[in-house]
Regions:
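A structural signal for well-ordered alpha-helical segments within the folded catalytic domains
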Residues: 18-21, 79-86, 224-232
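Substrate-binding rim/cap in mid-to-C-terminal beta-strand-loop elements of soluble/periplasmic
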Residues: 136-148, 152, 179-188
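C-terminal catalytic/acceptor-binding lobe
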Residues: 217, 221, 241-324
């Protein structure tokens, strides 16, 4: 595992600066060498230089990489991730051999058994089958077609698969390996990530245009276009991809009983109506929760002790204690 590097890619904005600090603290706690942590930041909103806050993260002993956000189309925000990975591997091709690509809003309850996952050429991913698998897409197709019985059958999945260049059969056969979120990537290069990036917006546009033509109340999740582009392009380039239980994650909406069953906590899912008993990161887009906690040690006392998010709060508290 000493060769494994840990990578996130996101805009250089305050919302991600504090998230990086928290997961880096957690990773180091779990024994990960800070030199194996790489943060790829996109200089956005017309900025031509890295922010001071982003440069400050170097003091954690981690690797920070900055690239100008010169994506062709920026209205689909998630495509910045594959864009930045593409730019990073273009500059540092040696890192394409093996890396764990993860979201910035995760922590490890315990380290996954990476040693058992890095021995072969298979790319291992977390289980997101429920919202990007073949069955999910077909459920969406059926909802659209039920409301519009004269519409072409399976048009949505056909148009989506045509964007990337994979067959519907390929997607169907890999229903049980339709994962994402966190990826143990092996033997990739910048050409692959360039295509992943380039296919994101066409996928997003394809879904949006279909929905505009056939609007329904419960549409397909447009925001996961980047996840489909990443997964399907791995198949396009003939990678073996498998969902691994060792990379399973709990959500921020879960309780501690569920949290204890997974190696990873993904701090997503909490909405504004749940913020009175769980940590809601949407309130901290422009505010640093670490600073709030420094000012008031009781800042997050409202968080339910049985909420998985209490574990995130505890890491924040530990980080602040270590800094003092």
């Amino acid at each position: 595992m000493e060769d494994l590097i840990f990578v996130t890619a996101q805009p250089d904005v305050p919302y991600f600066h504090w998230q990086v600090r928290i997961y880096v603290h957690n990773f180091i706690q779990k024994g990960i060498n800070p030199n194996n942590i790489h943060v790829i930041s996109g200089m956005v909103n017309g900025n031509k230089e890295p922010t001071l806050e982003s440069l400050e993260l170097k003091k954690l002993g981690i690797n920070i990489h900055h690239y100008l956000d010169n994506r062709h189309k920026k209205y689909y925000i998630p495509n910045i991730k594959p864009f930045l990975v593409y730019k990073w591997l273009e500059q540092y091709p040696q890192f394409g051999k093996l890396f764990f690509l993860h979201d910035a809003d995760i922590i490890f309850r315990e380290l996954p058994d990476f040693n058992s996952l890095i021995k072969d050429k298979t790319i291992y991913v977390s289980d997101t089958i429920g919202y990007i698998g073949y069955n999910y897409i077909m459920d969406c197709c059926n909802r659209y077609e039920k409301q519009y019985p004269n519409s072409p059958k399976q048009q949505l999945i056909t148009d989506m698969s045509d964007v990337v260049g994979v067959s519907i059969n390929k997607i169907k056969e890999n229903q049980n390996n339709s994962g994402g979120g966190q990826y143990l990537i092996k033997n990739s290069d910048y050409h692959i990530w360039q295509k992943i990036y380039m296919d994101c917006v066409p996928l997003y546009d394809t879904m949006m245009n279909y929905h505009k033509k056939y609007p329904i109340g419960a549409p397909i999740q447009f925001w996961t276009a980047e996840m489909w582009s990443l997964l399907w392009n791995l198949w396009y380039f003939n990678f073996d991809v498998k969902v691994s239980e060792k990379l399973s994650f709990s959500w921020a909406t879960d309780n501690n009983f569920i949290y204890e069953k997974h190696t990873i906590l993904h701090m997503a899912g909490v909405t504004e109506d749940l913020k009175h008993s769980k940590f809601y990161k949407g309130e901290y887009i422009n505010v640093n929760p670490l600073e709030k906690l420094k000012e008031n040690p009781n800042q997050f006392d409202y968080v339910d002790k049985n909420s998985s998010t209490i574990n995130y709060i505890n890491i924040m508290k530990d980080l602040i204690e270590k800094e003092v």
